[in-house]
């Protein structure tokens, strides 16, 4: 039991009452974070291997980011992108400095899905084409434009024809023949994640991603890599495409880009940017000075602290430890850097719940069978040891089938009790 179940919090009640209802809320209220640790309102600590779906790769409340935000908040928070701003210029310079060569034009926005929207529009104006190739099991976000690239039917079907799924061909991630057949002279862009995150933590093969580069060039289409989850050191390089020696024409960026502030970008080659008419796209909050200040501090800290090397080394350490777990429930441990998935032979949800509830470790699902770990790169090896030990205990102790049967037995006996007492009351009246 968490403290909240014993003593329901007013914050938990308020959030559950007023939220739109689209989220499956946990029974816990988080109030503070530092590095790889977060604390709930009752003071219980958790090792965070979710970090806001992969946002806080630098750790929660990194001191440089906190200082930059504090200073900028007292100076200037709002300036639209039509009016140049010192922090925005500094951020753009820093960002282009770490991006693969040639990606030196940037559209700034606020979330991953907006970066995908931008990518879609820039690809259409750059090529004069409007067909796309995306990947089965791919996830690109949930706005209607981005949703057209997202494969999972449950995210698309509730919105029927409002999601444009006629102009997108989905190919099996890794299938070279399907890829070659799908990319034609009508294709504006091929969209893919270098490691599928939501789709089960699946790294692309070098052959597949390199063939995507080759065939898009041959057909005059763009290659757009979705590095929203993989970017900014998560996979052990600043960007995952560096593992494959591939430079795309455009790259969508978000999550860890700016120290936890809601920031995103579509970075592209000049030839792609130059074809968008002035005023053809825009956003109010994109490139706001507050996020830009956080972004500058975050990018500098990533470089100074060797965050990519940390993610590479700790990722290998954690993956080795997970692979050493002897459990018949594990089908496969896979990933790249600190983007790690453990595919089980059964549903992952009860194990993820037990990790949080019983062990104080936050992790998340990626498809119903996969437990996904996205710890910050500043996590210590001791914390990794704790996470792996907790996971092993949970695999040993949780038995969803037995628990479900016990639940059913309890329900049946409760119903039996009710029938007996109803029967008794009838008799006694
Ligand atoms: C690969 C990928 N693309 C796009 C998105 C959408 O980003 P956002 O949730 O910021 O809109 C996500 C979010 O998880 C993602 O992992």
Swiss-Prot record:
Q: What is its EC number?
A: 2.6.1.118
Give binding positions for pyridoxal 5'-phosphate. 112-113, 139, 226-229, 284
CDD domains under this entry? Answer: OAT_like
Biased composition annotated in UniProt, kind: Low complexity: 411-429
Disordered as annotated region, ranges: 408-429
Where is the protein situated, by its record's location annotation? Cytoplasm
Enzyme class label: transferase
Give the CC-aspect GO terms.
Answer: cytoplasm
Any one Gene Ontology biological process term?
lysine biosynthetic process via aminoadipic acid
Q: Which InterPro entries match?
A: Aminotrans_3 (IPR005814), Aminotrans_3_PPA_site (IPR049704), Class-III_PLP-dep_AT (IPR050103), LysJ (IPR037537), PyrdxlP-dep_Trfase (IPR015424), PyrdxlP-dep_Trfase_major (IPR015421), PyrdxlP-dep_Trfase_small (IPR015422)
- Record-level Gene Ontology MF annotations: identical protein binding; pyridoxal phosphate binding; transaminase activity
Q: Name one Pfam family in it.
A: Aminotran_3
Q: Which residues of the sequence carry a binding annotation for substrate?
A: 142, 283
In terms of Gene3D superfamilies, this protein maps to: Aspartate Aminotransferase, domain 1, Type I PLP-dependent aspartate aminotransferase-like (Major domain)
Reactions accelerated catalytically: [amino-group carrier protein]-C-terminal-gamma-(L-lysyl)-L-glutamate + 2-oxoglutarate = [amino-group carrier protein]-C-terminal-N-(1-carboxy-5-oxopentan-1-yl)-L-glutamine + L-glutamate
Pathway assigned in UniProt = Amino-acid biosynthesis; L-lysine biosynthesis via AAA pathway; L-lysine from L-alpha-aminoadipate (Thermus route): step 4/5
Q: What is its main location?
A: cytoplasm
Instruction: Write down the SUPFAM superfamilies for this protein, in alphabetical order.
Output: PLP-dependent transferases (SSF53383)
Q: Which cofactor does it need?
A: pyridoxal 5'-phosphate
User: What keywords sit in the KW lines?
Assistant: Amino-acid biosynthesis, Aminotransferase, Cytoplasm, Lysine biosynthesis, Pyridoxal phosphate, Transferase
On this chain, the residues bearing N6-(pyridoxal phosphate)lysine are: 255
The UniProt function text for this chain reads: Catalyzes the transfer of the amino group of L-glutamate to [LysW]-aminoadipate 6-semialdehyde, generating [LysW]-gamma-L-lysine.
Summarize subunit and interaction data from the UniProt record for this chain. Answer: Homodimer.
Similarity-based family? Belongs to the class-III pyridoxal-phosphate-dependent aminotransferase family. LysJ subfamily.
| Protein name as it appears in the record | [LysW]-aminoadipate semialdehyde transaminase
- Per the UniProt record, the source organism is Deinococcus radiodurans (strain ATCC 13939 / DSM 20539 / JCM 16871 / CCUG 27074 / LMG 4051 / NBRC 15346 / NCIMB 9279 / VKM B-1422 / R1)
């Amino acid at each position: 039991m968490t403290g909240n179940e014993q003593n329901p919090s007013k914050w938990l009640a308020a959030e559950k009452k007023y939220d739109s209802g689209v989220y499956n809320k946990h029974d816990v209220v988080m109030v503070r974070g530092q590095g790889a640790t977060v604390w709930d309102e009752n003071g219980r600590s958790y090792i965070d291997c979710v970090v806001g779906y992969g946002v806080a790769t630098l750790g929660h409340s990194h001191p440089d980011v906190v200082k930059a935000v504090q200073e900028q908040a007292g100076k200037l928070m709002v300036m639209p992108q039509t009016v140049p701003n010192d922090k925005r210029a500094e951020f753009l310079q820093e960002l282009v400095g770490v991006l693969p060569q040639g990606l030196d034009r940037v559209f700034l926005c606020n979330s991953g899905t907006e970066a995908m929207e931008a990518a879609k529009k820039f690809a259409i104006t750059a090529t004069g084409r409007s067909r796309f190739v995306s990947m089965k099991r791919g996830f690109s976000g949930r706005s209607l434009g981005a949703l057209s690239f997202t494969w999972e039917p449950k995210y698309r079907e509730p919105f029927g024809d409002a999601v444009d799924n006629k102009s997108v061909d989905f190919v099996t991630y890794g299938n070279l023949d399907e890829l070659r057949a799908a990319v034609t002279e009508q294709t504006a862009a091929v969209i893919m994640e270098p490691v599928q995150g939501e789709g089960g933590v699946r790294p692309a093969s070098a052959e597949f991603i390199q063939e995507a580069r080759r065939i898009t060039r041959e057909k005059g289409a763009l290659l757009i890599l979705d590095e929203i989850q993989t970017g900014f050191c998560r996979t052990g390089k600043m960007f995952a495409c560096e593992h494959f020696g591939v430079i795309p024409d455009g790259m969508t960026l978000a999550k860890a880009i700016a120290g936890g502030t809601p920031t995103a970008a579509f970075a592209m080659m000049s030839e792609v940017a130059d074809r968008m008419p002035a005023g053809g796209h825009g956003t109010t909050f994109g490139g706001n000075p507050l996020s830009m200040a956080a972004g500058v501090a975050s990018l500098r800290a990533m470089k100074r602290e060797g965050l990519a090397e940390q993610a590479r080394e700790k990722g290998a350490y954690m993956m080795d430890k997970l692979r050493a777990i002897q459990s018949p429930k594990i089908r496969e441990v896979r990933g790249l850097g600190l983007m790690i998935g453990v595919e089980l032979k059964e549903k992952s949800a009860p194990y993820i719940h037990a990790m949080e509830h019983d062990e104080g470790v936050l992790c998340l699902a990626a498809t119903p069978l996969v437990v996904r770990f996205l710890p910050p790169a500043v996590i210590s090896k001791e914390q990794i040891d704790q996470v792996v030990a907790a996971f092993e205990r949970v695999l040993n102790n949780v038995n969803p089938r037995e628990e479900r049967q016990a639940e059913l037995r309890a329900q049946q006996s409760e119903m039996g009790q009710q029938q007996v007492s109803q029967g008794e009351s009838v008799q006694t009246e």
